[in-house]
Amino acid sequence: MPHRARDTVLEPPELRARREFPVAWAGAGPQHPGMIRKAPKSDAAPPAKGVIAVAPPSFRRERALLKRGIWPVAGCDEAGRGPLAGPVVAAAVVLDPKRIPKGLDDSKKLTAEKREALFEEICATASFAVAYASPARIERDNILRASLWALARAVQALPEPPKHVFVDGRDKIITPCDCDAVIGGDALVLSIAAASIIAKVARDRLMCRLAEDCPGYGFDHHKGYGVPEHLAALDRLGPTKHHRKLFAPVAAAWDKHAPGERETAAAPPDLFGLSASA
């Protein structure tokens, strides 16, 4: 039976180092496995105090498991918890240790152009799966449970069941194998970083398609987030079937455009499925 992995949530050594040593030297020389670089051995002037050199995500956790014969190892992340419209999109990725795309990082640190390029590289070299939690599921389960459900579904949809899973954040997901929750994992674990890119690009592309279905809301620009342009459209046009009606700005728009109907309106069915590729 599926079970939850160990109850403890890992605090990565990188984050512990950053918490315990808030000021660090940055410069040339061998890089510490975590987020702190050692003081330069050269005579070059040190950088200003308070600067922390942040290393890119690494493959060391996955490689350690691979050396123990534990493989495949999947990284999981989601995109779209905060928007007022559209689904939460979750991705699970198993990187090929011999064909890891260069430049993988937390999707939030990358430009849209770089994310798109890496998305194509990941799809061409890795196994992955994408799952969607629709606004209907978010309304039924709440945003956290819907997100965890989508993450678990993405893992289940992988072409080959993983033997270990790393998931971004504090919350583990229910899997048939061990699962480690890694706080800040999209900036620390390479497989999670890859999953963050897949989830982000998949969701952005979906929101651009929804913009064609719902003109006037600007979904292709803000991707459903509560920016002034979106709030103005909600106030002017009212909510669509893609909006999350329990989120406060959407609820206010419901009450303005259809008083009394928000609680009785039937939630639309799940409009999104899942996809996977080896």
From Swiss-Prot:
Coiled-coil regions in this chain? none
Task: Provide the E.C. number(s) assigned to this enzyme.
Answer: 3.1.26.4
GO CC field: cytoplasm; ribonuclease H2 complex
Manner of cofactor binding, per the entry note: Manganese or magnesium. Binds 1 divalent metal ion per monomer in the absence of substrate. May bind a second metal ion after substrate binding.
Looking at the record, the residues that make up the RNase H type-2 domain are: 71-259
Q: Which residues bind a divalent metal cation?
A: D77, E78, D168
Q: Which Pfam families match?
A: RNase_HII (PF01351)
Q: What class of enzyme is it?
A: hydrolase
Q: What is this protein called?
A: Ribonuclease HII
Which organism is this protein's natural source?
Answer: Rhodopseudomonas palustris (strain BisA53)
Q: Which gene encodes it?
A: rnhB
